[in-house]
């Protein structure tokens, strides 16, 4: 019988060359010290501060902490932003909760349970945590835009041929994006293509309920993004439709944040999205139809030390493309709590040759709430 080989022999090292602390045990010891003497006391203090003075907490968080980590090396800044997001996941908080008392965390859990019903509770908890991490990363990137450090960040583009072809032939393009990963920052990166870009924001951040430090963070982000856009700018969607139309007539790229539900009295733009036919606001489609501009979409994600902007293919449904990206990385969709506000199109009769369908939508109240308190 062949003798089994034993483990490889340890090299004949001098006793002083052998670590008296096995690396695994040492790391565990350091993590234990950090958890009990730094992490827990710090979390307790921040939780106490938030309860005692929410205004002071948000001022320190948005007005001091985010600008501070924006000046750090990217790896450090992203790590601290994710840690901030994990803390917010633990508390079930984000800026909408600070501002409106909105129960974003409860709707988020409901969406995860709907879309990942077959997953274990631990796997769903990881998605929940990732959602808050990525919203925190988006706010970190907002601070980085204001600091001007994003100009040196490397960017790669995928699927660019369709975009360049559309601009060469029709001189105008409507792009849909979403509250997913780094896609808002991706709007600024589009300026590198050389075309004027007009992006969409929302005046929800100016409401009186929103802490001043939060409003400043988002307004500074929008202003900083405008410097990337080759003469374009970021405009609030509320009340500025004529300016979007005039800009597109002249020629350029208009970016619409498209993962918003329709207004209560608006006819939805339906698309296959996360397993069902769901209805969205019509703004992007209406602009495209009005000016015969191609309608495409993009997402932006951070991977392997750089950002990647990925475009849909010509002729591909732009919302279905976004759906496919979200499906692969659900935790990066930090507006997933709006899923329940999308009207759902379902069959109201037996299938026929005409394929007629009926609409079963959410209530006008739910849609209005999502619009008024939606992500910026």
Question: Can you annotate each of these PLM segments?
Answer:
Residues 104, 182, 217-219, 240, ...:
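Residue-level preference for nonpolar/small residues embedded in alpha-helices
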Residues 171-236:
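Catalytic core of membrane glycerolipid acyltransferases/transacylases, capturing the structured
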Residues 140-144, 183-185, 207-209, 263-266, ...:
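Short catalytic/ligand-binding loop motif for oxyanion handling, primarily in non-cytosolic enzymes
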Residues 192, 236-376:
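Non-catalytic C-terminal accessory region of glycerolipid acyltransferases
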Residues 146-150, 224-232, 268-273:
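Short, basic, glycine/proline-bearing loop/turn elements
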Residues 2-177, 182, 219-224, 366:
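Membrane-anchoring hydrophobic helices of lipid-metabolizing enzymes
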Residues 163-164, 187-188, 222-227, 244-245, ...:
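Short amphipathic alpha-helical segments and helix-helix/interface helices
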